[in-house]
């Protein structure tokens, strides 16, 4: 019997701000199955968010909220000393903004995924993770919560489950992994991958259940969705290469599902 492999392909997007464009959503969205939309705190603005919701709906994408720290200058990738209460409120506020546009456009929220430094913090800081999960459970309990694939996501997955949330695991074909299955620091040489062919090769491996680490080892990695970063200058080329490579290796792309 042949086993059919299926995965979701998502990207962080909707990140333009006013007169300053970032990424190429018009060319990227047709290549995806899901999208994580910036909500104005780390990137994006109301007009960009509304336009991104419309574009995602046109292409039948699963739409996800991508809340981050209130840090436009640092693109949400710097740690901020927000309290758990502030994290909960900021998460509710940002998801609420997306919910408004989804209501207007007749869409539904598929998932929630934290951005940047907040994403890392809720995986490592239990109180922060509790606050984030509580906000999601309060407002959109039907949405999937995205966590890191591998050991790095295990604690947050347990916290999410305790709040009655459904978890989906995410892997990054254009990011390097350490020997313990965690994302390599962006400060390390080779931590970010810009070659579409290499990202595609890694995506196929991830769909098959493994990832090659910085040290060259092959590590088991179970995941449900692949993520690329829309601010990567090669994002469109990477997404296209991944789609082609997955198809060539018998992997079907589909939105997140039970």
UniProtKB/Swiss-Prot annotation:
Forms a complex composed of PxpA, PxpB and PxpC. The keyword Nucleotide-binding applies. Belongs to the LamB/PxpA family. It catalyses: 5-oxo-L-proline + ATP + 2 H2O = L-glutamate + ADP + phosphate + H(+). Pfam families: LamB_YcsF. Its EC number is 3.5.2.9. The keyword Ribosomal protein does not apply. GO terms for biological process: carbohydrate metabolic process. One of its GO terms (molecular function) is 5-oxoprolinase (ATP-hydrolyzing) activity. It comes from Deinococcus radiodurans (strain ATCC 13939 / DSM 20539 / JCM 16871 / CCUG 27074 / LMG 4051 / NBRC 15346 / NCIMB 9279 / VKM B-1422 / R1). Disulfide bonds: none annotated. The gene is pxpA. InterPro entries: Glyco_hydro/deAcase_b/a-brl, LamB/YcsF/PxpA-like. This is 5-oxoprolinase subunit A. Catalyzes the cleavage of 5-oxoproline to form L-glutamate coupled to the hydrolysis of ATP to ADP and inorganic phosphate. Keywords: ATP-binding, Hydrolase, Nucleotide-binding.
